[in-house]
């Protein structure tokens, strides 16, 4: 007995996440995508945004190839379309299938970066982290600490995905080349820090490893003598893996974090004020031109 075509149908999001090398992704819920607030600002970053969004949501989208096929229909059907009030878009305004697929994947990646910093998305990514889907840190003293995907920038097209270790605070290139085509912006810069703060057990795992190996830090030696850090060949990244031990150091770290957050807030506020001033200047120039023309 033949199977129902609807039962065999696989949603677009599921197909994308099951592609080779796409197992870092989680499936974004349709409710999240259909909320316009979650898509704010993405229309300017993705070509054929509307068509790409419809593709992700499994709506039928007309492409340039479909338009060329429709041109072979009879004049009778065209007359019926005009009587029914439907209109055909010009072929030059429609994306081809390859461009539409690229735009849909780009849009999904940018939505994915926003989804994984939501409560639902963090929970889904935490499950993958717990299963070690992202791999383990290659550093010996991290004792197989699970890695977290991260992007060095939130702008797509700049750099591919990297893996962050919360234990040594360093980043690594994925060991398999199949992940080197995944854009880092699809995970963003915020996700790793938010995941660590939302799930304190990750910091507890790091603390156990740090305590375990704190007395056995490896250092290069020549004939039994350690190489001085000020030497040209001395260690350079030891500070990156230092953690506060005394109560005073912990308070100092807390103070530095607060000051950093305050500085970031002030910088963002200053940039917003500058943008408002530029908009006011542009409006004044437009008013002056209007008055001059009158």
Swiss-Prot record:
Ranges of biased composition (kind: Low complexity): 70-87
The entry's keywords: Phosphoprotein
Entry coiled-coil feature ranges: none
Post-translational modification, as annotated: Phosphorylated by alpha subunit.
Chain positions covered by the region annotation Disordered: 66-90, 269-294
Ranges of compositional bias, category Acidic residues: 273-288
GO-annotated cellular components: CURI complex; cytoplasm; protein kinase CK2 complex; small-subunit processome; UTP-C complex
SMART domains for the chain: CK_II_beta
UniProt-listed InterPro entries: Casein_kin_II_reg-sub_N, Casein_kinase_II_beta-like, Casein_kinase_II_reg-sub
Molecular function in Gene Ontology: protein serine/threonine kinase inhibitor activity
Stated family: Belongs to the casein kinase 2 subunit beta family.
Quaternary assembly: Tetramer composed of two alpha chains, one beta chain and one beta' chain.
Role noted for this protein: Regulatory subunit of casein kinase II/CK2. As part of the kinase complex regulates the basal catalytic activity of the alpha subunit a constitutively active serine/threonine-protein kinase that phosphorylates a large number of substrates containing acidic residues C-terminal to the phosphorylated serine or threonine.
Protein name (Swiss-Prot/TrEMBL): Casein kinase II subunit beta
Originating organism: Candida albicans (Yeast)
Lineage: Eukaryota, Fungi, Dikarya, Ascomycota, Saccharomycotina
Gene: CKB1
